[in-house]
Amino acid sequence: MTTWDKCLKKIKKNLSTFEYKTWIKPIHVEQNSNLFTVYCNNEYFKKHIKSKYGNLILSTIQECHGNDLIIEYSNKKFSGEKITEVITAGPQANFFSTTSVEIKDESEDTKVVQEPKISKKSNSKDFSSSQELFGFDEAMLITAKEDEEYSFGLPLKEKYVFDSFVVGDANKIARAAAMQVSINPGKLHNPLFIYGGSGLGKTHLMQAIGNHAREVNPNAKIIYTNSEQFIKDYVNSIRLQDQDEFQRVYRSADILLIDDIQFIAGKEGTAQEFFHTFNALYENGKQIILTSDKYPNEIEGLEERLVSRFGYGLTVSVDMPDLETRIAILLKKAHDLGQKLPNETAAFIAENVRTNVRELEGALNRVLTTSKFNHKDPTIEVAQACLRDVIKIQEKKVKIDNIQKVVADFYRIRVKDLTSNQRSRNIARPRQIAMSLARELTSHSLPEIGNAFGGRDHTTVMHAVKAITKLRQSNTSISDDYELLLDKISR
């Protein structure tokens, strides 16, 4: 057993399985008397191993070999190439000692040419703190089977098409823009940036773009992915020394669709790679479509240069659909499932589930499954029984006085201003927003809502709801405020 074999056993005990397999196992250490040469395969590995594991490697070799040694770090594969850095440890060196560093030679990076697919060699199931180099989250596991062929991106799902997307005031602009870029990619709205809360149809629209663009031009190279997969692709290309292939694939797309782009914020390496990918595609007239749960300027940690580029094209929102659209979504979904759903039952479900489309469809499935299991029609009574917990949660969480307090705090006014007769814009607009929220988030009737706002007529509430619905489509500031308030009130 070599000295390095002994060291590996000790190092393995101090690291997670993922760290050991990702960073330590791939390196090769050659010993020549007191000289230990650490071959790190590429510059990324070398820098990360020196900064992250250098002290651990040094102290472990000292423990197994003795203090009088020299450690050399190379950014090459093991084949006797030039050395980049040398660390000399004398008899007094220990784990916490300051080591001397001598730069002997700066090796030129060697490009590795491989086939379009990459062979993954990791079988990791654990993930620890080795994300510092790339900045990816600890929750993102990069797993693969031995010798599994690796391809980039994610498949488009055939069920996500424009015909199955129910259009309403809350999403009609986004849908129209999505259709335009699927027919004429790279001409208008580049990039197309779609934002909105979870479960409101962003992914549906994005994949519908890809599916329709493929119908229009079967030869178009369309790459769909999400930010998590993009990060995994990038990290794996580095681990497998195949960044050229990563760049070739992503930068040769005719249409690039990336879902949940907000998750690259704070991931320095990935963000930089995406920045260059964006520039390459944009300059070549290729279409870029992105989705996020926030408006670009509100994505915390996102580089300013990316925020600026997202503004090159069109930014549109998808909001929670209004009551009529929610009913239409339920009726279409039931029809697609081959089930009959009475209009009044659809209206009941739509009135009581106002969080997002995903939960709306989940409630429908619950009602249809229960009615089928009990050999009953999906009546309002069945829906009431199925959704009683959902309704209780809604009623428990959302009350008009709570809405008034949250809105007043948000706009830094008093609750009594909302119920007063003041008509100044800084009071009237928040009052309209609060009324619209009360209509959307509670089961109170229009007269009840009007009464809670200083005894106003139900027609005033109707006007407020229509005004805010229209403003959310044309005024980004109002739309953003409304979404933030929805989130605050629903917590």
Swiss-Prot record:
Residues 372-491 are annotated as: Domain IV, binds dsDNA. The keyword Cytoplasm applies. Gene3D superfamilies: 1.10.1750.10, 1.10.8.60, 3.30.300.180, P-loop containing nucleotide triphosphate hydrolases (3.40.50.300). Residues 155-371 are annotated as: Domain III, AAA+ region. It holds the Pfam family Bac_DnaA_C. Residues 1-69 are annotated as: Domain I, interacts with DnaA modulators. Disulfide bonds: none annotated. GO terms for biological process: DNA replication initiation; regulation of DNA replication. Domain I is involved in oligomerization and binding regulators, domain II is flexibile and of varying length in different bacteria, domain III forms the AAA+ region, while domain IV binds dsDNA. This is Chromosomal replication initiator protein DnaA. It comes from Francisella tularensis subsp. tularensis (strain SCHU S4 / Schu 4).
